[in-house]
């Protein structure tokens, strides 16, 4: 580390020296009058004669506490350099003289903080000296505080020990200040009832100083939440200052109860209602310290039923019942409290309840279609008095316990719900429902059909017929034609059942119609689907005629071929007749031996056939 500038802040000291033969000569010596350095650093002390005589000797002396001088070094210039001799005083590391003739003190300790005298001897020019003071600074260790860990009473009429603060191994002696909630405490050192401090300073073997400060205060109840700490202030070179703060701490105080609070800790209404079956907490709290005992009781007329005693101020009523409604009390057992302080607090606990709802009808209520009036009553018992309403499909039907059903239709069927609740007590509610079943003959709803195009149907058109029915008991759907699908609920619901039938439109079907019928034990109802006029399929009829003609022609050809094959072996069959009249012959018999006159007439030429002349002759016969 660089030594501080020994020339900084020079004080020129002028000495008047005597010369020979009564003549006087002046010699001035320049040294830094005060050198400040941190402990452990290095310092170099400069000593320079102002007149620069040709030859001189420079000597350094250490002045001890008694004022005695001890020679440290002798320095003599040789050209541009200085030759020095160091006289050891047992210092480690020893004193040194550098090439500029300065006295070097390495690793400065507190003991090096002395006065150093530089003496310059210049022969005929005279002798002069000057003193340089070295001041050593040391930063103390971290500030430590030891608070009083006992219980301090605010009822004491004198100052009590609060804490002890220590700042160790500093130089010069540090200073200690005290703070409450960040504000400095102006506490004197004189003993008094309100507060004071005591200070003890110790010089350690190292030469450093340790300071201990103890704070005494008369405490008040407001100090229960106060944060205290101390700080050590110390000096640094060049007029600088440092500060080391301790950690903050709080005190444990003993003070009597002045106020008591008693309330319901679990969820409750502003009126004090709690739900039956809940776990209810009763909380009691006094502002005394340490926490006193809390005694819980229930008021039974003029008597008190003792419930619990604890230090937590907490009483839990598990699964509270309606018969536990009443007046509850809390007593703070603080014998240091003032007689005027109210140590007993009471509250009234209201247990809200709601019994299961009762309906005047069974879970399934059967009524007949178009019945005049049916009244259903919902009985709700509870505290506070519940409000009741009737709903169906989340729609409110009536406010109050009475539900009147008039002119009942199938649309009236469904689930009716009685809802009871207590607006002042959240989440305390009940519901009860019944199913209304309407009995009666079926209602039928056909699905109207329209022609595919135009205003008429065409022969062969396919159409899906649908019938929907409802009633109780559930109606049965039947068709006048076969092929219907099983009944199934339609999209609209509400008890409707549907059945579908796929048919092809024909003229006969148009005349007769297609009917569907719904029936149950209470009656039946039907509907006939008509198709109106049905146009023939012209293009398709022509194709059918052509197909029949082709079939007939093919049949004739097959018959002719078969006949020819049968007659192939007979004489004169299938050959050309000779010219002239054929000879007379017997008629042929069939294979069965019977005559075939029809064949004879068909195969032989008639009277006009034999008279043909020229090249005509008989045509082929067969």
Swiss-Prot record:
* Gene Ontology BP annotations: cell adhesion; cell-matrix adhesion
Topology of the protein relative to the lipid bilayer: Single-pass type I membrane protein
What SMART domains does UniProt report for this protein, alphabetically?
IG, IGc2
Q: Which UniProt keywords apply?
A: Cell adhesion, Cell membrane, Disulfide bond, Glycoprotein, Immunoglobulin domain, Membrane, Phosphoprotein, Receptor, Repeat, Signal, Transmembrane, Transmembrane helix
Q: Which residues are glycosylated?
A: 314, 323, 370, 377
Chief location bin: membrane
Q: Which residues lie on this side of the membrane: Cytoplasmic?
A: 563-622
Q: Could you identify this protein by its name?
A: Basal cell adhesion molecule
Q: What are the Ig-like C2-type domain coordinates in residue numbering?
A: 267-342, 356-435, 442-532
Secretion signal, residue range per the UniProt entry: 1-25
| Record GO terms (molecular function) | laminin binding; laminin receptor activity
Q: What does this protein do?
A: Transmembrane glycoprotein that functions as both a receptor and an adhesion molecule playing a crucial role in cell adhesion, motility, migration and invasion. Extracellular domain enables binding to extracellular matrix proteins, such as laminin, integrin and other ligands while its intracellular domain interacts with cytoskeletal proteins like hemoglobin, facilitating cell signal transduction. Serves as a receptor for laminin alpha-5/LAMA5 to promote cell adhesion.
Q: Name the SUPFAM superfamilies on file.
A: Immunoglobulin
List S-S links within the chain: 47-118, 165-230, 284-330, 378-418, 467-516
Q: Which residues cross the membrane?
A: 542-562
Database matches in InterPro entries: CD80_C2-set, Ig-like_dom, Ig-like_dom_sf, Ig-like_fold, Ig_sub, Ig_sub2, Surface_Rcpt/Adhesion_Mol
Modification sites for Phosphoserine = 590, 592, 594, 615
Q: What ranges does the record give for the region Disordered, renumbered to this chain?
A: 574-622
What top-level branch of life does the organism fall under? Eukaryota
Q: Which GO terms describe its cellular component?
A: cell surface; plasma membrane
The UniProt entry's coiled-coil ranges are: none
What residue ranges lie in the Extracellular compartment?
Answer: 26-541
- What Gene3D superfamilies does UniProt report for this protein, alphabetically? Immunoglobulins (2.60.40.10)
**Which PROSITE patterns would you find in this protein's record?**
IG_LIKE
Instruction: Tell me the lineage of the source organism.
Output: Eukaryota, Metazoa, Chordata, Craniata, Vertebrata
């Amino acid at each position: 580390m660089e030594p501080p500038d020994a020339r900084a802040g020079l004080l020129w000291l002028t000495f008047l020296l005597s010369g020979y033969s009564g003549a006087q000569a002046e010699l001035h010596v320049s040294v830094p009058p005060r050198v400040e350095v941190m402990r452990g650093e290095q310092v170099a002390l400069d000593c320079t004669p102002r007149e620069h005589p040709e030859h001189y000797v420079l000597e350094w002396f250490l002045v001890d506490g008694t004022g005695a001088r001890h020679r440290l070094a002798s320095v003599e210039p040789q050209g541009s350099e200085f030759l020095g001799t160091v006289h050891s005083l047992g210092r480690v590391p020893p004193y040194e003289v550098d090439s500029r003739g300065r006295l070097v003190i390495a690793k400065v300790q507190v003991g090096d903080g002395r006065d150093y005298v530089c003496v310059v001897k210049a022969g005929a020019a005279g002798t002069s000296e000057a003193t340089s003071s070295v001041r050593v600074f040391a930063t103390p260790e971290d500030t430590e505080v030891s608070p009083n860990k006992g219980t301090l009473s605010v009822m004491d009429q004198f100052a009590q020990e609060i804490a002890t603060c220590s700042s160790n191994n500093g130089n010069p002696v540090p200073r200690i200040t005290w703070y409450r909630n960040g504000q400095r405490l102006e506490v004197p050192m004189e003993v008094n009832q309100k507060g004071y401090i005591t200070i003890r300073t110790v010089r350690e073997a190292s030469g450093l100083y340790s300071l201990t400060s103890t704070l005494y205060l008369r405490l008040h109840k407001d100090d229960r939440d106060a944060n205290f700490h101390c700080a050590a202030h110390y000096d640094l070179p060049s007029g600088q200052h440092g500060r080391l703060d301790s950690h903050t701490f709080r005190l444990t105080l003993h003070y009597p109860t002045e106020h008591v609070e008693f309330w319901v800790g679990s969820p409750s209404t502003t009126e004090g209602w709690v739900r039956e079956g809940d776990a209810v907490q009763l909380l009691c709290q006094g502002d005394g310290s340490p926490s006193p005992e809390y005694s819980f009781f229930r008021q039974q007329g003029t008597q008190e039923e003792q419930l619990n005693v604890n230090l937590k101020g907490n009483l839990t009523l598990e699964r509270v019942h309606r018969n536990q409604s009443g007046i509850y009390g809390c007593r703070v057992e603080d014998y240091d409290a003032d007689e005027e302080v109210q140590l007993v607090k009471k509250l009234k606990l209201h247990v809200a309840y709601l019994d299961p709802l009762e309906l005047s009808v069974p879970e399934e209520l059967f009524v007949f279609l178009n019945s005049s009036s049916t009244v259903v009553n919902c009985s709700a018992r509870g505290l506070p008095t519940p409000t009741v309403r009737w709903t169906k499909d989340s729609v409110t039907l009536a406010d109050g316990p009475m539900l009147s059903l008039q002119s009942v239709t199938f649309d009236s069927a469904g689930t009716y719900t009685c809802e009871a609740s207590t607006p002042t007590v959240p989440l305390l509610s009940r519901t009860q429902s019944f199913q209304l079943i309407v009995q009666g003959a079926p209602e039928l709803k056909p699905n109207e059909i329209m022609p595919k195009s135009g205003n008429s149907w065409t022969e062969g058109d396919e159409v899906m017929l649908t019938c929907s029915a409802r009633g109780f008991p559930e109606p049965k759907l039947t068709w006048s034609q076969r092929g219907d699908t099983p009944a199934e609920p339609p999209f609209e619901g509400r008890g409707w059942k549907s059945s579908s039938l796929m048919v092809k439109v024909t003229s006969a079907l148009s005349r007769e119609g297609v009917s569907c019928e719904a029936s149950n034990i209470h009656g039946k109802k039907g509907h006939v689907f008509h198709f109106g006029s049905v146009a023939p399929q012209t293009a398709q009829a022509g194709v059918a005629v052509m197909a029949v003609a082709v079939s007939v022609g093919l049949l004739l050809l097959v018959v002719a071929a078969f006949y020819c094959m049968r007659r192939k072996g007979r004489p004169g069959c299938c050959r050309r007749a000779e010219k002239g009249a054929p000879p007379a012959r017997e008629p042929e018999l069939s294979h069965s031996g019977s005559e075939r006159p029809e064949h004879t007439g068909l195969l032989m030429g008639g009277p006009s056939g034999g008279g043909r002349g020229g090249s005509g002759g008989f045509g082929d016969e067969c």
